[in-house]
Amino acid sequence: MPPGLTLDALPAPLPVIVNPHGGPWSRDNWGFSSEVQFLCSRGYAVFQLNFRGSTGYGRDFLEKSYKQWGLTMQNDITDGVHWLIDSGIADPKRIAIYGASYGGYATLAGACFTPELYCCAIDYVGVSNLLTFLQTIPPYWRAMLDMMYEQIGHPDRDRAQLEATSPALHADAIRCPLFIAQGANDPRVNKDESDQMVAALRLRGVEVEYMVKDNEGHGFANQENVFDFYRAVERFLQQHL
C-alpha cells in the first residue's frame, strides 16, 4: 500500500500494479521487498498473489499448473484483479501489470488475453512465444526437458495450445502501451523472445518502449543498469498509470 494508507480506510480506489511472480514454480512470501516499496512510495498499491503452481501449498496445487500457462494460471490472476475492483481497492481504469521471467509472460498474457483490464504493462525478461522458448532453453536445462514438456507442453503434441497461449502470436489483441526490458546475454529467456514481441507490437502500431542491456543476462545485476531500469519504470508508470 502507498504510505499512510490501509485497506480499511481508503479515501478512493487506488492505482494498482499487479505483480505476478516468476518461476512460475516459486512463490511470493511475507517480508520486505525493496522493489515493492519503491512502487508503493510512488503512490501505487502492489498486488502479489500465489496463483496455482506456486510452491508451498502442496503437490496437488502445484500440479494444477501443468500445461496451464496462459489458461487457468492466468485466470487466477484475472480473478484476483476482479476481486480488487469489486472490493473497491483498485481503480478499474488505473491497473497496470508488471512481472519478470514467468511474471513477464503473465504480464504479456494479461495484456493480450484480457486487454480490457490493464492500462499499461511492463515485461521484464519474459517469455513471449512458448514454442521458441522450449527450443532455446540453456544446455543446463536439457536434462529437464521431458519434465518441462509435462509442465508447459510438448511442441508437437500440444502445439495448438502452445500457439494459442503465446502472446507474440496474438499481439494484435494488445491495446495498452508496454515497456519491455531484456538482457542481451540471457541464457534462460533468449533475447529473441523480447525481440519477437517488440516486432509484433510495432508492426501493429502499439506503443512499446524497449530497453536492452548488452552486459546483462536473466535480470539486471549491474547497478547502473538497475538504476536505468527503475528510472524507466518510474517514468513509464507516471505517464500511463
Language-model segments: residues:
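Short beta-strand element of the alpha/beta-hydrolase
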Residues: 9-22
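Short loop/turn elements that form and flank the Walker-type P-loop nucleotide-binding site
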Residues: 11-13, 33, 42, 174-175
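Active-site-proximal cap/loop segments of hydrolase catalytic domains
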Residues: 35, 48-241
